[in-house]
């Protein structure tokens, strides 16, 4: 039997630009006691374990995307779709519904635990771009100056972010906004305050 909504964890999404520090924020929430998962982790699982995904990738992109272990290799997939909008759109259309399914299953499993966490947090890079914000109770946007993000990622400027919603619009639509220009300790302290608010809200629902 499904638990009432009051017993379910507060569902939080973290989003932001490339190199802003989304994964670092997820680590901070994990350290503060939240249940966490990233879209990247879910994609890794799908590529490793879902035969239907493997077959679809080989049919579309060719057997060259397989690694030596016979599983889809993420770097080879990236090379096959980078700079080819049609292929990238196809890949996103294949994976995004599956990622959403896996995430919702994870969230349901958390709610069925004898002692479910009060807060569950997920890193979703394309949250607004794929229209997934309505699946979450709260949204956190992590931003940082462009030069700092490029330094963190060790990549040159390219057109990847041209496809993304501008930071100012993400911030306008979010519940929380953190400018990540400091240390992990700075973020950890900020996350502590957010967790206190989220847990208080979860308690009020119970």
Q: Which functions belong to the PLM regions below?
A:
Residues 23:
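Walker A/P-loop
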Residues 104-152:
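ATP-dependent NMP and nucleoside kinases share a basic, alpha-helical "lid"
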Residues 14:
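Hydrophobic anchor at the beta1->P-loop junction of P-loop NTPases
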Residues 41-119:
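ATP-dependent small-molecule kinase phosphotransfer cores
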